C-alpha cells in the first residue's frame, strides 16, 4: 500500500523571515503589546504604462506578456478615460497594464525582487527612501524589465519600465520604512 499524504506548500522564505524575526523585532522597537499591531505588507501593485500603445496597439501585448512572466499572474489592462487629440489617444484605448499581488505570490515576488532583480541593475547604489506617500505606502520605479531573470534578454522587443507600489498596513511612513528596511529593501543612505 502506498502512502498518500499530501505535503502543505512551502511558506515563502521572506514571509517566514517576517513572521519569525521581523515581527518580534518591530514589536520591541515600537513597544507593541500585541503582534497584530505590527505593520505588515498588504499588497504589491506592479504596473506598466505603455504610452506608445496609443500609436501601435501591438505594444500592449508585449507589456502583458512581460508582466505575466515577472509576476506569475495575468495583468489587468488599463484603458484611456478620455480622448486626447495631441497624444493621438482615443477613449477606451489600451494604454497600460497592472497586477495586484497578495498572499504567497506577493511574498515570492518581493523575495525575487530584493534578492535577484535589484542586484542585477548596473551601478545600483540603492533605491530612494523618500518616495513614501504619507500613508505608509512606498512607490518606486524600475527603468527596464530585463533585470528579472524570467525575461529572456534576447526576446525583448522594447524596453519597458515599471512602477511598483508596496502597500503596508500602517499609516506612518517612519514605521513603514523600518518594516521595509527589515525586509531587505536597499534604501540609499543620505
UniProtKB/Swiss-Prot annotation:
Pfam families: Ribosomal_L5, Ribosomal_L5_C. InterPro entries: Ribosomal_uL5, Ribosomal_uL5_bac-type, Ribosomal_uL5_C, Ribosomal_uL5_dom_sf, Ribosomal_uL5_N. GO terms for molecular function: rRNA binding; structural constituent of ribosome; tRNA binding. The keyword Hydrolase does not apply. Keywords: Ribonucleoprotein, Ribosomal protein, RNA-binding, rRNA-binding, tRNA-binding. One of its GO terms (cellular component) is ribosome. One of its GO terms (biological process) is translation. This is one of the proteins that bind and probably mediate the attachment of the 5S RNA into the large ribosomal subunit, where it forms part of the central protuberance. In the 70S ribosome it contacts protein S13 of the 30S subunit (bridge B1b), connecting the 2 subunits; this bridge is implicated in subunit movement. Contacts the P site tRNA; the 5S rRNA and some of its associated proteins might help stabilize positioning of ribosome-bound tRNAs. Belongs to the universal ribosomal protein uL5 family. Part of the 50S ribosomal subunit; part of the 5S rRNA/L5/L18/L25 subcomplex. Contacts the 5S rRNA and the P site tRNA. Forms a bridge to the 30S subunit in the 70S ribosome. This is Large ribosomal subunit protein uL5.
Amino acid at each position: 500500500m502506498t502512502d498518500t499524504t499530501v505535503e502543505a506548500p512551502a511558506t515563502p522564505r521572506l514571509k517566514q523571515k517576517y513572521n519569525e524575526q521581523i515581527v518580534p523585532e518591530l514589536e520591541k522597537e515600537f513597544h507593541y503589546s500585541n503582534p497584530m499591531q505590527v505593520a505588515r505588507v498588504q499588497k504589491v501593485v506592479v504596473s506598466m504604462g505603455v504610452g506608445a500603445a496609443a500609436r501601435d496597439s501591438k505594444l500592449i501585448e508585449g507589456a502583458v506578456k512581460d508582466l505575466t512572466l515577472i509576476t506569475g499572474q495575468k495583468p489587468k489592462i488599463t484603458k484611456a478615460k478620455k480622448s486626447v487629440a495631441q497624444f493621438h489617444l482615443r477613449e477606451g484605448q489600451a494604454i497600460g497594464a497592472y497586477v495586484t499581488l497578495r498572499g504567497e505570490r506577493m511574498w515570492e515576488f518581493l523575495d525575487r525582487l530584493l534578492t535577484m532583480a535589484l542586484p542585477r541593475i548596473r551601478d545600483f547604489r540603492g533605491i530612494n527612501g523618500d518616495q513614501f506617500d504619507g500613508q505608509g505606502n512606498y512607490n518606486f520605479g524600475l527603468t527596464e524589465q530585463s533585470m528579472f531573470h524570467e525575461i529572456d534578454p534576447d526576446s525583448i522587443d522594447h524596453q519597458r519600465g515599471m512602477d511598483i507600489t508596496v502597500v503596508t498596513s500602517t499609516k506612518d511612513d517612519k514605521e513603514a520604512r523600518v518594516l521595509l528596511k527589515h525586509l531587505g529593501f536597499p534604501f540609499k543612505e543620505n
